[in-house]
Regions:
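DNA polymerase processivity clamps
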Residues: 1-44, 48-100, 115-232
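Bateman (tandem CBS) regulatory domains
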Residues: 110-114
Length: 232
């Protein structure tokens, strides 16, 4: 849960609430949300034995430390909230963090409706193709990758004035809709794909300048949203 959201917190102190992850507990469900205004990560998880609803913001730095303590095979984690603190009981370890003050923004309105294009793609192939294409983008100092869809293929390209252009193609499955061109930050995209623990990724595009969504195929528990970059 932490690894799938914490990477998207803001590192800027201009809006302190965005340096934390919003934990919303209601109706036996935990919804974790993190955003730095350029991307958004959401993870949903069913809970047991919830005594009351909560809406708190936990500092991203504290969650990063907690993640180091937790091992993958821990059966249960007990969580206790006080007015301005949270306690995690992990095995024999008690981990206490302060809570951030303020109201977390309503991020549900960021999600567009009615996609123009939807497709499925192999997570590993997509990730490594972006990684290869981003080498030139990083050389150019901008991290921008251009993506175009069409005929069951996704084409990725990046350009460096000094070196030239690199192009990568990845096969897409279950393509709905026409063709589209969009640009994005390669690091944001790779972070999002890494957070999706699934071999197949579903991508929904809503327009060249609208946010696009990634999630595991057939699973709504993890959602990654990325804002595009204007290049076209």
């Amino acid at each position: 849960v932490i690894a799938q959201t914490n990477f998207a917190v803001s590192t800027s102190e201009t809006r302190p609430v965005l340096t934390g992850v919003n934990w919303l507990i209601q109706e036996n469900e935990l919804i974790c949300t993190a955003t730095d205004s350029h991307r958004l990560a959401v993870r949903k998880l069913q809970l047991e034995d919830v005594s009351e609803n909560k809406n708190v913001i936990i500092p991203g730095k504290a969650l990063a430390e907690l993640n180091k303590i937790m091992s993958d095979n821990e059966e249960d984690i007990d969580i206790f909230f006080a007015s301005n603190q949270v306690l995690f009981k992990v095995g024999n370890v008690n981990f206490i963090s302060r809570l951030l003050e303020g109201h977390y923004p309503d991020t549900t309105r960021l999600f567009p409706e009615n996609y123009e294009i939807k497709l499925s793609i192999d997570n590993g192939e997509f990730y490594h193709a972006i990684d290869r294409a981003s080498l030139l983008a990083r050389e150019g100092g901008n991290n921008v990758i251009k993506l175009s869809t069409g005929d069951d293929v996704v084409e990725l390209s990046s350009t460096s004035p000094e070196i030239g252009t690199v192009k990568e193609e990845v096969d897409a499955n279950d393509v709905e809709g026409g063709s589209l061109k969009i640009s994005f930050n390669s690091k944001y995209m790779m972070d999002a794909l890494k957070a999706i623990d699934n071999d197949e990724v579903e991508v929904e595009f809503f327009g060249t300048m609208k946010p696009f969504i990634l999630k595991p195929k057939g699973d709504d528990s993890v959602t990654q949203l990325i804002l595009p970059i204007r290049t076209y």
